[in-house]
């Protein structure tokens, strides 16, 4: 299965009538493996900060997490595995696997829990596959 298929069929799937605003699978260096049509472009320093937070949980908490220049308040995730952020009525979930970052961005009416489920389910599957 191609990386784009994972984005199109697994991350952008419909859940209770809603779906993510955008999603992507990136390499740890920020290289885009696949993305939805309107996924925002990460800046290199944003990826560096996100990867540092996975290595040093709490690194982003004081400053917030930036994605394409937009600031997200970092909320409770899973240290070293999942970073979650909130911005207005929406937010972001990032799941780290051995080789990739699985990213989902949502807006209402999708809920944070629905976003977490979609992103973390695919991330857990990729971890099981050695990715």
From Swiss-Prot:
Q: Where in the cell is it found?
A: Cytoplasm, Cytoskeleton
Key word Metal-binding present in the record? no
Q: What is its main location?
A: cytoplasm
Q: Which residues form a coiled coil?
A: none
Any one cellular component term from GO for this entry?
cell cortex
Output one GO MF annotation.
actin monomer binding
| The record's account of how the chain is modified after translation | Phosphorylated by MAP kinases.
Q: Where is this motif: Involved in PIP2 interaction?
A: 81-97
Keywords for this protein: Actin-binding, Allergen, Cytoplasm, Cytoskeleton, Disulfide bond, Phosphoprotein
One of this protein's Pfam families, by short name?
Profilin
- Cysteine pairs bridged by disulfides in the record: 13-115
Gene3D superfamilies, per the entry: Dynein light chain 2a, cytoplasmic
Which parts of the sequence carry Phosphothreonine?
111
Assembly description = Occurs in many kinds of cells as a complex with monomeric actin in a 1:1 ratio.
Q: Which family does it belong to?
A: Belongs to the profilin family.
Further notes on this entry?
The variability of the residues taking part of IgE-binding epitopes might be responsible of the difference in cross-reactivity among olive pollen cultivars, and between distantly related pollen species, leading to a variable range of allergy reactions among atopic patients.
Role according to the record: Binds to actin and affects the structure of the cytoskeleton. At high concentrations, profilin prevents the polymerization of actin, whereas it enhances it at low concentrations. By binding to PIP2, it inhibits the formation of IP3 and DG.
Instruction: List the protein's name.
Output: Profilin-2
Q: Which organism is it from?
A: Phleum pratense
């Amino acid at each position: 299965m191609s990386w784009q298929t994972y984005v199109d069929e697994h991350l952008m799937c419909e859940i209770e009538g809603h779906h993510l605003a955008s999603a992507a699978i990136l390499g740890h260096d920020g290289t885009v493996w696949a993305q939805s049509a309107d996924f925002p472009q990460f800046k290199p320093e944003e990826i560096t900060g996100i990867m540092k937070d996975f290595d040093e949980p709490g690194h982003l908490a004081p400053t917030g997490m930036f994605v394409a220049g937009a600031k997200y308040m970092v909320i409770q995730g899973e240290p070293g595995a999942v970073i979650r952020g909130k911005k207005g009525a929406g937010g972001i979930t990032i799941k780290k696997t051995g080789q990739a970052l699985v990213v989902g961005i949502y807006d209402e009416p999708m809920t944070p829990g629905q976003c977490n489920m979609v992103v973390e389910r695919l991330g857990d599957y990729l971890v099981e596959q050695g990715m």
